[in-house]
């Protein structure tokens, strides 16, 4: 266990930095209160490189992200893609976006050993995963009364990703828990853009497919995987018998993309947007702007 009450100037060993320690960086002191945790699939995982802290000068609560180098391989269809963390990229994006309402805000300092220390403002709100899960109503009512407004907000968020792409950056890890629905104004705010990936042939494709996942989640009021469809027949009835491989996601191969087979009131125009991300797709979106154009076309038809 880390000793308490130490003054930390080297963040290389982030596991050894714990509650009660004070981080000294660029002449500023931050009292460490603990680690952030990630909640996914019912599992709570501590993120030891992401610290909860209090600014010793202002008393404000902050999130501090320390340098953490990791990599893994993911699949896009039959293509294997190396993904990795890049603290410097996130630092560059923080500079680029400034006070842009669609991104988290923060500043990067260097510790005594040259490690980047990102000091982030807390985005107060609910992540998109929980926000959509909070609609306690039948899907058809949700689809007709709530979804149009959600899609308009998503378009704003998608435009923010297009802004990154225009400047040569990728978000790198687009997920429904990396969008925060902000308290008050309701802006959709992107967080956690330190992931990067190697795919020079189509440099923005993982971001584009990540946006497809957000759309699938929003339109379906949750994800619908084959295991659920096959086993929860009291909800899905005979849907499993009517599905083909082409109805599922190219990126997440057991996730239903052809939602019109489940909810026949979804118009073909909207469902066709989703089908660009399916295993049966013959045409894929090459840019965020193409998705935005089709979403605007659908909303204009309502």
Where are the regions a protein language model picked out?
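Terminal C-lobe "cap" of eukaryotic-type protein kinase domains
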Residues: 279-302
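Catalytic-loop of the protein kinase fold
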Residues: 161-176, 181
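Conserved structural core of kinase catalytic domains
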Residues: 105-146
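C-lobe/activation-segment region of protein kinase-like
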Residues: 188-270
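Juxta-kinase regulatory segment immediately upstream of eukaryotic protein kinase catalytic domains
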Residues: 1-41
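Conserved HxN/HPN-centered segment at the entrance to the catalytic loop
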Residues: 92-111
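Activation segment signature within eukaryotic-like protein kinase domains
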Residues: 153-154
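ATP-binding glycine-rich loop module of kinase domains
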Residues: 37-95
